[in-house]
């Protein structure tokens, strides 16, 4: 894994509204399958003098034949800004947020349909009975 990897950034735009720099990342990786996003985040953090957690990379496509990948990168001014503006699924990937576990689709539908069966005054009474039974 000691093969040289070259990272170039182009189309660098400073986005003050979202407190970040955004750019296209070109990665040259000859004699190597690909470069991990984690490794790219580390190297970009060095280049832009930012924390690794404030750097986000995504959308990488490897050219046919390998050796070159192109993707998109974001460097936020701070980790707090990254947590504020980045989508939750990316924060989960980077270990900055917990994944929200929700009931399965089938369970949600079954609950919705159960709730539809009781309505009006009966619904009020059903809630009252459920509360009384819970105590």
Curated annotation (Swiss-Prot):
There is a cross-link at residue 21 (Glycyl lysine isopeptide (Lys-Gly) (interchain with G-Cter in ubiquitin)). The modification Phosphoserine is found at residues 14, 56. It comes from the Eukaryota. InterPro entries: eRP_eS24_sf, Ribosomal_eS24, Ribosomal_eS24_CS, Ribosomal_uL23/eL15/eS24_sf. N-terminally acetylated by acetyltransferase NatA. Also partially acetylated by NatC. GO terms for cellular component: cytosol; cytosolic small ribosomal subunit; mitochondrion. The modification N-acetylserine is found at residue 2. Residues 105-115, 124-135 have a biased composition (Basic residues). Keywords: Acetylation, Cytoplasm, Isopeptide bond, Phosphoprotein, Ribonucleoprotein, Ribosomal protein, Ubl conjugation. It is found in: Cytoplasm. One of its GO terms (molecular function) is structural constituent of ribosome. Pfam families: Ribosomal_S24e. The keyword Methyltransferase does not apply. Its main location: cytoplasm. Signal peptide: none annotated. PANTHER family: 40S RIBOSOMAL PROTEIN S24. Component of the small ribosomal subunit (SSU). Mature yeast ribosomes consist of a small (40S) and a large (60S) subunit. The 40S small subunit contains 1 molecule of ribosomal RNA (18S rRNA) and 33 different proteins (encoded by 57 genes). The large 60S subunit contains 3 rRNA molecules (25S, 5.8S and 5S rRNA) and 46 different proteins (encoded by 81 genes). Component of the ribosome, a large ribonucleoprotein complex responsible for the synthesis of proteins in the cell. The small ribosomal subunit (SSU) binds messenger RNAs (mRNAs) and translates the encoded message by selecting cognate aminoacyl-transfer RNA (tRNA) molecules. The large subunit (LSU) contains the ribosomal catalytic site termed the peptidyl transferase center (PTC), which catalyzes the formation of peptide bonds, thereby polymerizing the amino acids delivered by tRNAs into a polypeptide chain. Belongs to the eukaryotic ribosomal protein eS24 family. There are 2 genes for eS24 in yeast. This is Small ribosomal subunit protein eS24A. It comes from Saccharomyces cerevisiae (strain ATCC 204508 / S288c).
């Amino acid at each position: 894994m000691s093969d040289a990897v070259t990272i170039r950034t182009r189309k660098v735009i400073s986005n003050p509204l979202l407190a970040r720099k955004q750019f296209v990342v070109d990665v040259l990786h000859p004699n190597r399958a690909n470069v991990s996003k984690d490794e790219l985040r580390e190297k970009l953090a060095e280049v832009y003098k930012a924390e690794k957690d404030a750097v986000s990379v995504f959308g990488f496509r490897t050219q046919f034949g390998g050796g070159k990948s192109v993707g998109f990168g974001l460097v936020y001014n701070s980790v707090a800004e990254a947590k504020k503006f980045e989508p939750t699924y990316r924060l989960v990937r980077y270990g900055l947020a917990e994944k929200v576990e929700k009931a399965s689709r089938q369970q949600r539908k079954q609950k919705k349909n159960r709730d539809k069966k009781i309505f009006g005054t009966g619904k009020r009474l059903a809630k009252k009975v459920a509360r009384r039974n819970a105590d």
